[in-house]
């Protein structure tokens, strides 16, 4: 855990210390009965001693369409590492360094102070902001940030990223996006929705809707495209959707299973699962030429599925029952050599590689309950991250510090998040229905 002020400098080292037949069936069952709803953050577990921080209402913030300082406070609170002071308890409201009375903040037990001022400009807004160490009475960070007329939430998330990195040594991920699938319910014709939102669930944007199930959304690394599975052709087919132009293109529609798309690091290829030749196998599709490369070759009783690229793009990590039960394997694309990676437990599936390429997260079954687990690839050491049940679809934040996953809460599907060290947890519950299949975006290039 990262605890309190004295531990923040060590944050970096401590925090960074598709579908098979069975998974497809599970996801389709769980997808039933979902309803549209906004996402609301609910922190379920934070650091034992979160660092007290005050984000003072920014000068010029009044009358703006977004409360920038409140968004920053919510971002930092959601990390679980910080506890923001309420403006109602503040003794003063400085917006520039000369106005800071450090005594006011020591009285409140505040370790760090964030202040700023927002002014309108010809092109939008300009914020000048700073981070201050209360005990040492010194400035730690000072920047000027400009955004367009609709960029106030982006401004807030960027400031949160800067503050988080300054205090933990880890790049923030508050400015990133998420994808997820939701179901409006059987009374709505086009009930299945692919949604894009900010990492905090705000600014939902409908990408695509269909009367047939949608599965496995996957971001391209340049954030301009999404690949996903749609059943609109009466069988699973893989589509790509351009987020800039809105254009959709069907990439596969082979007989049998077409599923689990995963973009290569350079976005030129998709790893995917096809059963056109019999049993489900891993293939690579060259998007420009449409050439197919078969990666795995097994007999008819074997299911190879849920591919995920290694960080260097030289291998594929995937789920297979070739050993009898679902386990995670890695295949080298140059050699074709297959290596088993998981040995603990009788069910490990849906692998996702961490950004540093050193570990992976997965769905792990223990005592008949599905949890999210982390494993060091080299040593094989595994730890269970979640205490919820029927957990699935893990997706890792681009800084490797947190992951999103789908789970059950109060008899409905929700999205939840957990830190890689399992010390921080929060939930993004739906107010009305269920949401599934999260995909956390990479960083913007």
From Swiss-Prot:
Pfam families: PD40, TolB_N. Residues 1-37 form the signal peptide. It comes from the Bacteria. SUPFAM superfamilies: TolB, N-terminal domain, Tricorn protease N-terminal domain. Coiled coil: none annotated. Keywords: Cell cycle, Cell division, Periplasm, Signal. It is found in: Periplasm. GO terms for cellular component: periplasmic space. GO terms for biological process: cell division; protein import. Part of the Tol-Pal system, which plays a role in outer membrane invagination during cell division and is important for maintaining outer membrane integrity. The Tol-Pal system is composed of five core proteins: the inner membrane proteins TolA, TolQ and TolR, the periplasmic protein TolB and the outer membrane protein Pal. They form a network linking the inner and outer membranes and the peptidoglycan layer. Belongs to the TolB family. This is Tol-Pal system protein TolB.
């Amino acid at each position: 855990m990262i605890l309190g002020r004295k531990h923040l400098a060590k944050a970096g080292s401590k925090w960074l210390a598709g579908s098979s037949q069975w998974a497809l069936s599970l996801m389709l069952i769980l997808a039933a009965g979902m309803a549209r709803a906004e996402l609301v953050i609910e922190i379920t577990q934070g650091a034992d001693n979160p660092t007290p921080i005050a984000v003072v209402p920014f000068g010029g913030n009044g009358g703006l369409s977004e409360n920038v300082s409140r968004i920053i406070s919510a971002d930092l609170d959601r990390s679980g590492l910080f506890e923001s002071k309420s403006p109602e308890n503040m003794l003063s409201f400085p917006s520039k360094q000369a106005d800071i009375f450090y005594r006011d903040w020591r009285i409140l037990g505040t370790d760090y102070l964030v202040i700023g001022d927002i002014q309108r400009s010809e092109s939008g807004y300009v914020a000048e902001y700073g981070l201050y160490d209360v005990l040492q009475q010194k400035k730690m960070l000072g920047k000027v940030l400009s955004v367009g007329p609709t960029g106030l939430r982006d401004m807030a998330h960027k400031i949160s990223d800067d503050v988080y990195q300054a205090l933990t040594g880890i790049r923030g991920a508050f400015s990133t996006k998420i994808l997820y699938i939701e179901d409006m319910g059987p009374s709505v014709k086009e009930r299945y929705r692919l949604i894009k939102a900010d990492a905090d669930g705000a600014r939902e944007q409908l990408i695509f809707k269909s009367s047939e199930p949608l599965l496995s959304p996957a971001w391209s690394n340049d954030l301009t495209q999404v690949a996903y599975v749609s059943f609109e052709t009466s069988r699973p087919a893989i589509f790509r959707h351009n987020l800039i132009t809105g254009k959709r293109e069907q990439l596969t529609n082979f007989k049998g299973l077409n599923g689990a798309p995963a973009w290569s690091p350079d976005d030129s290829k998709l790893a995917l699962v096809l059963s056109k030749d019999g049993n489900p196998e891993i293939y690579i599709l060259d998007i420009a030429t449409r050439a197919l490369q078969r990666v795995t070759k097994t007999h008819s009783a074997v299911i190879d599925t849920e591919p995920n690229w290694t960080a260097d793009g030289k291998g594929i990590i995937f789920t297979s029952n070739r050993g009898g039960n679902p386990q995670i394997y890695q295949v080298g694309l140059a050699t074709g050599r297959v290596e088993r990676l998981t040995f603990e437990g009788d069910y490990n599936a849906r692998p996702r590689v961490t950004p540093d390429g050193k570990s992976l997260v997965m769905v792990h079954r223990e005592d008949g309950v599905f949890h999210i687990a982390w494993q060091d690839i080299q040593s094989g050491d595994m730890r269970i991250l979640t205490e919820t049940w029927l957990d699935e679809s893990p997706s890792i934040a681009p800084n490797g510090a947190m992951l999103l996953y789908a789970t059950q809460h109060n008899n409905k599907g929700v999205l939840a998040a957990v830190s890689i060290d399992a010390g921080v947890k929060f939930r993004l519950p739906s107010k009305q229905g269920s949401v599934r299949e999260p995909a956390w975006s990479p960083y913007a290039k």
